[in-house]
Amino acid sequence: MDIGSNEILVASDYDRTLASEENNFVISPIVSQKVNEFSKKYKFVVVTGREKKFIDKLAVGLKPTAWILENGSLILFNDREFVLCEKSWFERDRKKIIEILDNLKVRYSIGRIILYVDGYGSKLDMLSEIEKYGRIEVNRNDAMILPKGVDKGVGVLKFKELTGFKGKIIALGDSENDYALFRVADIKVAVANAIPQIKEIADIVTENPNGLGVVEILDKILSGNFGKEVDIY
């Protein structure tokens, strides 16, 4: 069954989904070529916790429909930028969080919007005071601090609103911060290297890991076979 171009949106995580850790998260030509081919017919968005400056270096040549960066807080689409948080985040909340991190002597980096705390995924008790001002999200052993009410799923829903998209969402992911992405998906796909908790809630687990798992799904959609295996409607 051929699926119409306005009927589906594929939303994919980046690290350990589109790009592998073994390749230092640099997108492979095979994956980027397939995504670019797919994006000419269907909507394909990359939904990642990463900042633009890193994506620009890692994903050279990748041309999705849109980028949803910093865990859903920043959308780049049609040469426009959409920030998904209130002014109070910059004027008050983020400043207070930085003060707390400095007092705890925790190392962090500041993105355009969110804060990154590497290696603190298992030490959330130390960061509990931060939850008065923002939301902590763990991804494997790292933690990201976001404005309240923002996550990958919120970013995807905002993109739907911006484009007037009414079709089905197919989400691909591998780890904890993809729970929010799966929450808004009609079909949830875990790549073969995903953590067990993500595989358990997925509708499909790919045979191949990382980007080859994404290619596997895109090929099925392009060939018309995806609709035969999964009830997209």
Curated annotation (Swiss-Prot):
Record carries keyword Transferase: no
Catalytic residues as annotated in Swiss-Prot or TrEMBL: 13 (nucleophile)
Keywords: Carbohydrate metabolism, Hydrolase, Magnesium, Metal-binding
Cross-referenced InterPro entries: HAD-like_sf (IPR036412), HAD-SF_hydro_IIB (IPR006379), HAD_sf (IPR023214), PGPase (IPR006382)
Binding site for Mg(2+): 13, 15, 174, 178
EC number: 3.1.3.18
Cofactor (UniProt): Mg(2+)
GO cellular component, one term: cytosol
Reactions mediated catalytically: 2-phosphoglycolate + H2O = glycolate + phosphate
Binding site for substrate: 152
Record's signal peptide: none
GO MF terms, alphabetically ordered: magnesium ion binding; phosphatase activity; phosphoglycolate phosphatase activity
Function: Catalyzes the dephosphorylation of 2-phosphoglycolate.
NCBIfam families, per database record: HAD-SF-IIB, Pglycolate_arch, SPP-subfamily
UniProt protein name: Phosphoglycolate phosphatase 2
Source organism of this protein record: Saccharolobus solfataricus (strain ATCC 35092 / DSM 1617 / JCM 11322 / P2)
Lineage: Archaea, Thermoproteota, Thermoprotei, Sulfolobales, Sulfolobaceae
